[in-house]
From Swiss-Prot:
It comes from Staphylococcus saprophyticus subsp. saprophyticus (strain ATCC 15305 / DSM 20229 / NCIMB 8711 / NCTC 7292 / S-41). Keywords: Chaperone, Cytoplasm, Ribosome biogenesis, rRNA processing. This is Ribosome maturation factor RimM. InterPro entries: PRC_barrel-like_sf (IPR011033), PRC_RimM (IPR056792), RimM (IPR011961), RimM_N (IPR002676), RimM_N_sf (IPR036976), Transl_B-barrel_sf (IPR009000). The gene is rimM. HAMAP family: Ribosome_mat_RimM. One of its GO terms (molecular function) is ribosome binding. Residues 95-166 form the PRC barrel domain. The PRC barrel domain binds ribosomal protein uS19. The keyword Heme does not apply.
């Protein structure tokens, strides 16, 4: 099974480097040189690339692919989704830890079982992760025990008890 690990937001320089906004965990492992990625393209066949280099720059992940040395060879992929086989999910997790790919796409419900929206993104803040939940509005839900009460990965369902003002 493939999981989404990021989106190509732009190119950088003239030597074929791309800027990637990650929506994945374990980026140090996923974006290492030698790792295989799949670029999903709208209404076209997916493309496979091997990562040649990786670095961080201004909060974005900067990648080059083997065999790509020119901006003209990569520019057409701006806006496309980067996927990877789910084999990195073998990393052992602690209690109450989940892979981003297990959380993104889940529907979030409040105490009354009213759907709030779907988790579309996860931000790491240092103290705890924050989930972006899009429904009628966009909400920022902290992943803390006082708020997140139950996560059913198989059922793609998350139950929360919103703090005062969280859903205003």
């Amino acid at each position: 099974m493939k999981v989404e690990i990021g989106k190509i937001v732009n190119t950088h320089g003239i030597k074929g480097e791309i800027k990637v906004k990650s929506n994945s965990d374990f980026t140090e492992t996923r974006f290492q040189p030698g790792e295989l990625v799949i670029i999903e393209r709208k209404n076209k066949e997916p493309l496979e690339f091997t990562i040649a280099s990786y670095r961080m720059h201004k909060g974005l992940h900067m990648l080059t692919f083997e065999g790509i040395n020119n901006i003209n060879d990569i520019e057409y992929l701006k806006g496309e989704t980067i996927m990877q086989e789910r084999d990195h999910e073998e990393i052992e997790l602690g209690e109450h830890e989940f892979y981003y790919s297990d959380i993104i796409g889940c529907t979030v419900f409040d105490d009354d079982d009213t759907p709030i929206g779907r988790v579309t993104e996860i931000f790491e803040t240092g103290a705890n992760d924050v989930w972006v939940v899009k429904g009628d509005k966009e909400y920022l839900i902290p992943y803390i025990a006082d708020v997140v009460k139950d996560i059913d990965v198989e059922g793609r369902r998350i139950q929360i008890t919103p703090m005062e003002g969280l859903l205003d």
